Design a protein with these regions (language model features):
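Transmembrane-helix bundle segments that line or gate the permeation/cavity pathway
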Residues: 2-23, 64-74, 79-82, 89-219, ...
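Long, contiguous internal "core" modules enriched in hydrophobic/ aromatic residues
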Residues: 34, 38-65, 154-354, 450
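Extramembrane terminal tails and long inter-domain/linker segments of multi-pass membrane proteins
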Residues: 1-44, 147-161, 191-227, 300, ...
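Hydrophobic alpha-helical transmembrane segments
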Residues: 93-101, 353-362, 428-429
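Extracellular/periplasmic helix-loop-helix junctions in multi-pass membrane proteins
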Residues: 256-260, 332, 370-371, 396-416
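Central hydrophobic cores of alpha-helical transmembrane segments
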Residues: 376-386
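Extended C-terminal subregions enriched in glycine
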Residues: 349-374
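C-terminal TM-helix exit segments that contain a strictly Trp-centered aromatic cap at the helix terminus
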Residues: 59-65, 133-144, 319-326, 387-398
Length: 463
C-alpha cells in the first residue's frame, strides 16, 4: 500500500495522488491510530528522544546558570546588546508560521492537500512559539518580572509603554500562541474521540475521553466543529501576516542603519513562511519514512511544499536585491556603509553564506527532479533553515556592531552559554514533538478519510 517515491501513483490528470489507492475508512483509521495505541515504541523514536532529552537538560542548565549569574554570561555588550537571544527569537517565531498557513489559510482556500500535514505542522507551530517565547523572557535579565509587560492595576499607577514595539511583540505573540493552541485542540477533538473508542488501556481511554469533551460524531457536533474551525481559521489568517510584521517593527522604527526600512514587514513575513515550510519538510520526510506513511504523505505533498518554499524564497531573494538597491539609490552614506559592511566587513563570510543558502542553492527547486528527490529536498530544507538563521544574525549583529560613530564600534562573539541556550531550545522543540507523535495522532484521521473516493458525494448521495 505504500507509495514508491520514485514511481508515485498518479491520477488521470497526470498529477500524483494525495493518498495512495487501496485505502478504506477503516485502514486509514487503523494505520494512524495504531502508531499511538498498539504499536510498540520503536527504537527510532527512543534514540532521537533521548538525544532531545539530553539537549533539554543542557537548556535547563544554561537557564539555571543565567538566572544565577545574569545575562552577562552571554556575549552581548555595547554596542551589540541584542545577540543570539533575539536572533533565535525571530527565527523560532518564523518557523511557526508555516503551521498556521497550512492549517488556516489553506483551509479557507479549500486546499485538500493540507489534510495529511496540517496536524503535525500545527504542533510544530506551538512548540516553535514556546521556544521563541523563552528568549525575550531570559533577555529581560529578571524574567520573574515579565508581568510588567502587561497592563495591570498597581500602586504606582505605571503602565507599559504602548508605543514600544517590544510591548506589541508581547500581545502579538501571546495572541498568536492562544489562537494556534485553540485551533490545534479543536482539530484534535474528533480524533481524540476515535482514540477513546479504540484504546484498550483504561487510563488512556479515560484521558482521551476527557480531552474529547463528549464528542459522539453527531450531526450537531460536526456542524459546531465546522463553525468553530472556520472562525478560528479566520482569526488565525491575519495573524500569519501580523505577527512577523510586528516583530519586524522592532527593527524598522529604530534609526540604526540597515534597519529603518519599509521593506522589512513583507520581507519578514515571506522569510517566516520560507523557513516554516523548510521545517515542515525536515519533519515530514523522516516521519513518512520511519512510520511508513508514504501512502498518506505522498510526493504531491512534498512537491507542493517545495513550490511554496520556492515562491517565498524568490520574495526573500527580491528583498535582498531591493535592500541593496535602496541603500545605493538613497544616497545616504550610513545606509550605503551598512550594506557595504555586510558584504566586506568582519562578518562578510556570514553574509555571503546566507546569500548562498537562501538565494543561490534553493534555485535548484525550479527543477521537478529536485523537488521530488527526497534526499535533495531534505538537504535543501536544512540549508534554508541555516540561511534564515544567518539572515537574522546579520540583520541584528552586523547592523549593531558598526553604526554612526566609529569610536563606538564593537564586535559580538557568542559564548558557550549562547550556544547552549540555542541548542537547548532545539532539544526542547524535539522533546515536545516526539512526545506529541507518541501520544497524539500526528496526521488528522478524519480529514485524511475525506480524501478517499468513498467520501465523495454526488447529487446528495454518498458513493
Amino acid at each position: 500500500m505504500a507509495e514508491d517515491p520514485r514511481n508515485p501513483v498518479t491520477v488521470p490528470s497526470g498529477r500524483p495522488t494525495l493518498i495512495a489507492p487501496g485505502h478504506t475508512f477503516g485502514s486509514v483509521t487503523d494505520k494512524i491510530s495504531s502508531i499511538v495505541l498498539t504499536r510498540r515504541t520503536p527504537l527510532f523514536w527512543f534514540v532521537p528522544f533521548l538525544i532531545a532529552s539530553g539537549l533539554l537538560m543542557v537548556f535547563l542548565t544554561a537557564v539555571a546558570y543565567l538566572l544565577v549569574r545574569g545575562v552577562g554570561i552571554w556575549g552581548i555588550k555595547v554596542p551589540v546588546m541584542w545577540g543570539w537571544a533575539i536572533t533565535n527569537f525571530v527565527w523560532w517565531i518564523g518557523i511557526g508560521h508555516a503551521g498556521t498557513l497550512i492549517s488556516a489559510i489553506l483551509l479557507l482556500l479549500r486546499q485538500s492537500w493540507r489534510n495529511s500535514i496540517n496536524r503535525f505542522a500545527e504542533a510544530m507551530t506551538l512548540f516553535a512559539v514556546a521556544c521563541a517565547g523563552m528568549f525575550p523572557l531570559l533577555h529581560l535579565g529578571r524574567p520573574w518580572l515579565f508581568y510588567w509587560f502587561f497592563p495591570y492595576p498597581n500602586s504606582m499607577n505605571i503602565q507599559p509603554q504602548f508605543r514600544s514595539p517590544l510591548i506589541w511583540d508581547v500581545f502579538a505573540v501571546s495572541t498568536y500562541a492562544t489562537v494556534s493552541a485553540l485551533f490545534w485542540f479543536v482539530g484534535l477533538i474528533p480524533d481524540l474521540a476515535t482514540l477513546r473508542d479504540r484504546a484498550r488501556n483504561r487510563w488512556a481511554r479515560a484521558t482521551y475521553g476527557i480531552l474529547a469533551m463528549g464528542w459522539r460524531g453527531a450531526a450537531s457536533h460536526w456542524q459546531k466543529y465546522e463553525t468553530a474551525s472556520l472562525l478560528l481559521a479566520g482569526l488565525a489568517t491575519p495573524l500569519v501576516l501580523s505577527v512577523h510584521t510586528v516583530v519586524s517593527f522592532d527593527f524598522t522604527i529604530a534609526i540604526v542603519p540597515g534597519w529603518h526600512s519599509t521593506i522589512f514587514p513583507p520581507y519578514f513575513v515571506a522569510g517566516a513562511i520560507y523557513s516554516g515550510f523548510a521545517m515542515v519538510l525536515v519533519l515530514a520526510i523522516p516521519l513518512r519514512a520511519m512510520y511508513g506513511l508514504e501512502d498518506l504523505i505522498t510526493m504531491r505533498h512534498l512537491d507542493n511544499m517545495a513550490k511554496v518554499m520556492l515562491a517565498t524564497g524568490e520574495i526573500v531573494a527580491y528583498s535582498y536585491v531591493f535592500e541593496a538597491f535602496i541603500a545605493w539609490y538613497s544616497g545616504n552614506p550610513f545606509e550605503m556603509f551598512a550594506m557595504w559592511n555586510r558584504m566586506t566587513g568582519p562578518y562578510a563570510p556570514t553574509y555571503w553564506l546566507l546569500i548562498f543558502c537562501n538565494l543561490v542553492f534553493p534555485q535548484l527547486l525550479w527543477w521537478k527532479k529536485i523537488r521530488t528527490n527526497i534526499v535533495w529536498l531534505f538537504v535543501m530544507s536544512l540549508d534554508v533553515l541555516l540561511g534564515m538563521w544567518l539572515e537574522r544574525y546579520v540583520i541584528i549583529v552586523v547592523s549593531l556592531s558598526r553604526d554612526y560613530v566609529p569610536s563606538a564600534w564593537g564586535y559580538y562573539w557568542p559564548t558557550i552559554w549562547d550556544v547552549a541556550t540555542y541548542v537547548g531550545t532545539i532539544g526542547l522543540f524535539f522533546f515536545l514533538f516526539f512526545l506529541f507523535i507518541r501520544s497524539m495522532p500526528m496526521i488528522s484521521i478524519f480529514e485524511v478519510r475525506t480524501l478517499l473516493p468513498q467520501a465523495e458525494v454526488t447529487e446528495g448521495v454518498e458513493k
